[in-house]
Amino acid sequence: KITPWKVSGKVNYDKLIKEFGIQPLKELPKIFDENLLFRRKIVFAHRDIQRILSALKEKKPFVMMTGLMPSGKFHLGHMLLAQQMIFYQKLGAKLYIAVADLEAYNTRKKSLDELRKVAIDEYLVNYLALGLSPKNIEFYFQSNRSNDARKSNAYYRLASNFSSYETFNEFKSIYGDINIGKINA
């Protein structure tokens, strides 16, 4: 069984691709061979990579968004994601990294102050040490998106806007076992 939070048992990648609603990676431009994760097929599937490929081909800007749950020590899995984001940044992506402190608060039962400290000391510092450029990036906390009123509720506005495009079953296929705290975050 695989969810974003846990892996147990033997991994059936074909089943995983089907369950998570993703597509296997096919031919990619040569520049992707420069990245170990793509070259070694550690990144083996995608959702909408054709949008990135089109933007690169047409020399148009594109963005990548990822998130992290500040639940503990930075580990190999976090490093692999950081390396992937660094690669996209080098290709010209503007990055958005959301710290899922509200989700961690609901699932890990730590204070928001503790979670903020872990996010900065364990994740952000390591991202920068691995080569993430502080330029062309927005690193923010769910609990405190911005002092700018236009951005402060952007997370919830986006979630509300996108929610009409996703069904509960699609959400569950992406995130696995869920509770109200995970849905809300």
Predicted regions and their residues:
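Short connector loops at secondary-structure junctions
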Residues: A98-R108
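Divalent-metal (Mg2+/Mn2+/Ca2+)-assisted nucleotide/phosphate chemistry catalytic cores
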Residues: L112-A185
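Short, charged beta->alpha transition segments
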Residues: H46-L56, I86, V125, K182-N184
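Short beta-strand segments at enzyme active-site cores
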Residues: M64, L95-A100
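Active-site-proximal loop/turn and secondary-structure-junction residues that shape catalytic pockets
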Residues: L68-P70, D101-E103, S143-R145
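Histidine-anchored nucleotide/phosphate-binding helix
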Residues: G77-I97
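Non-catalytic terminal extensions that flank enzyme cores
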Residues: K1-L68, I137
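Short, glycine-rich nucleotide/cofactor-binding loops
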Residues: M69-M79
